[in-house]
């Protein structure tokens, strides 16, 4: 009986979990985070956001200061557009619907260092 109980306990413990781990960031995102951590802290803090936009996963890098535009990249690190920022504050005009149509917002990383 003890052997049967031990076998059942071992079987239960060694069963694979049904929970799935979240998908890992692309390697280039991790490289960008490492690079951003080497820079001086931004004000506002540097951050990377993931969204779904026009049927694809995209990564949004908010503007940091003044007239610097934001950057929106696809999952292969190709530049999609600049949704905001720049001289007029409304980006390059190539994705003016981004803020209205984006979905599945996920914060990938935010710099926790203070300036």
Please name every model-derived segment.
Residues 2-4, 18-115:
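N- and C-terminal low-complexity/disordered segments
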Residues 7-15:
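Bacterial N-terminal signal peptides
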């Amino acid at each position: 009986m003890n052997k049967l109980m031990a076998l059942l306990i071992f079987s239960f413990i060694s069963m694979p979990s049904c929970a799935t781990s979240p998908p890992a960031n692309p390697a280039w995102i991790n490289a960008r985070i490492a690079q951003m951590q080497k820079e001086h802290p931004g004000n506002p803090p540097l951050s990377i956001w993931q969204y779904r936009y026009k049927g694809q996963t995209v990564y949004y890098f908010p503007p940091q200061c003044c007239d610097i535009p934001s950057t929106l990249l696809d999952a292969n690190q190709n530049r999609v557009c600049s949704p905001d920022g720049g001289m007029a504050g409304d980006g390059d005009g190539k994705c003016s619907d981004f803020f209205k149509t984006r979905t599945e917002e996920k914060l990938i990383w935010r710099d926790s260092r203070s300036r």
